[in-house]
From Swiss-Prot:
It comes from the Bacteria. It catalyses: a fatty acyl-[ACP] + phosphate = an acyl phosphate + holo-[ACP]. It is an enzyme of class 2 (transferase). Belongs to the PlsX family. Its main location: cytoplasm. Its EC number is 2.3.1.274. One of its GO terms (biological process) is fatty acid biosynthetic process. InterPro entries: FA_synthesis (IPR003664), Phospholipid_synth_PlsX-like (IPR012281). This is Phosphate acyltransferase. Pathway: Lipid metabolism; phospholipid metabolism. The gene is plsX. The lineage of its organism: Bacteria, Pseudomonadati, Pseudomonadota, Gammaproteobacteria, Enterobacterales. Keywords: Cytoplasm, Lipid biosynthesis, Lipid metabolism, Phospholipid biosynthesis, Phospholipid metabolism, Transferase. GO terms for cellular component: cytoplasm.
């Protein structure tokens, strides 16, 4: 395995260094080829490294950054005041080639804006999208995007997301000729926003996309599609609703029947069922798939859930490792060239999808 270096915005997220630093040490234990640049306030980070051994310390470096992008700051405001923040410094390390990827649990809008400003979108991509790979009930995986980078999306952006999602599903997840669907409130052609209906018409005429139509949110985990495309507002709400339901379900499995007097054989049966069902559905635990890749950039950026615990943030670090090893930006760029000639974007003129040059 080739050595690689990641930049961590350790100050971001709801819990900051108290979660991100222990997660960094956990990631170092799991990967002997990994070096981490911990970006943040040295006075806060250093005490949290007290338990790190000599070998771990040899693969750690603290990069000073005294300020933090506020979680409630407007993206435009956060970008203007971003100089010297842990998020911006971490992204600059990627831009300068000192790190191969950035991981942050900070403000999503600010991360998207700064990443677009510093790392630049790929040719033919208007705006990057947050993407994750979710497990489904057929024991396969579904690529879902956008998960919150772009609240309002027009039809062209949705088509671009579909192209990127299909490339990711085929090149990284290993799904041949992946099925692509648009998330909508119904399967009928007349349902949904204008942008969704327009994107549907455009996708039907893109020969490189195996477009299968609309999919409703209740079928997200059924395995009916390999790529599910939506705007960032809808995607974020859908993902967090699903995460909440899964957490409640797993919690109920553990607590069901506690405090009630039962026969010994009923207690044994209950415990066996709890363990069996927990194993069966544990792959749906949100902590196990934390970390959304900001797809469509010339560099690798992973957005962790802001409320991630140590285990979940360590998973986000591993997501960054895999994205770098699989050369996700390079593969996306290479495939986009075969779909859109350099400097062009899709345009629906009523006769199918043509191409027009960026102005």
């Amino acid at each position: 395995m080739t050595r690689l270096t990641l930049a961590l915005d350790v100050m971001g997220g709801d819990f900051g260094p108290s979660v991100t630093v222990p997660a960094a040490l956990q990631a170092l234990n799991a990967n002997s080829q990994l070096t981490l640049l911990l970006v943040g306030n040295p006075d806060i980070i250093t005490p949290l490294l007290a338990k790190a051994d000599f070998e771990q310390r040899s693969r750690l470096q603290i990069i000073p950054a005294q300020s933090v992008v506020a979680s409630d700051a407007r993206p435009s405001q956060a970008i203007r005041a971003s100089r010297g923040t842990s998020m911006r410094v971490a992204l600059e390390l990627v831009k300068e080639g000192r790190a191969e990827a950035c991981v942050s649990a900070g403000n999503t809008g600010a991360l998207m804006g700064l990443a677009k400003l510093l790392l630049k979108p790929l040719e033919g991509i208007e705006r990057p999208a947050l993407v994750t790979v979710l497990p489904h009930q057929q024991k396969g995986k579904t690529v879902v995007l956008d998960l919150g980078a772009n609240v309002d999306c027009d039809s062209t952006m949705l088509v671009q997301f579909a192209v990127m999602g299909a490339v990711l599903a085929e090149e990284v997840v290993g799904i041949k000729n992946p099925r692509v669907a648009l998330l909508n409130i119904g399967e009928e052609e007349t349902k949904g926003l204008d942008s969704i209906r327009e994107a549907s018409l455009m996708l039907k005429t893109v020969p490189t996309i195996n477009y299968i139509g609309y999919l409703e949110a209740n079928e997200l985990l059924t395995g009916k599609t390999d790529v599910l495309v939506c705007d960032g507002f809808t995607g974020n709400v859908t993902l967090k609703t699903m995460e909440g339901v899964v957490r409640m379900f797993l919690s109920l499995l553990k607590s069901q029947g506690e405090g009630k007097k039962r026969s010994w054989w009923l207690l044994l049966l209950k415990r066996w069922l709890q363990k069996s069902l927990t194993r069966r559905f544990s792959h749906l635990n949100p902590d196990q798939y934390n970390g959304a890749c900001l797809l469509g950039l010339r560099g690798t950026v992973i957005k962790s859930h802001g409320a991630a615990n140590q285990r979940a943030f360590a998973v986000a670090i591993e997501q960054a490792v895999q994205a770098v090893q699989r050369q996700v930006p390079q593969r996306i760029a290479a495939r986009l060239e075969s779909v859109y000639p350099a400097g062009f974007e899709p345009l629906d003129d009523g006769k199918g999808v043509n191409l027009r040059a960026h102005r």
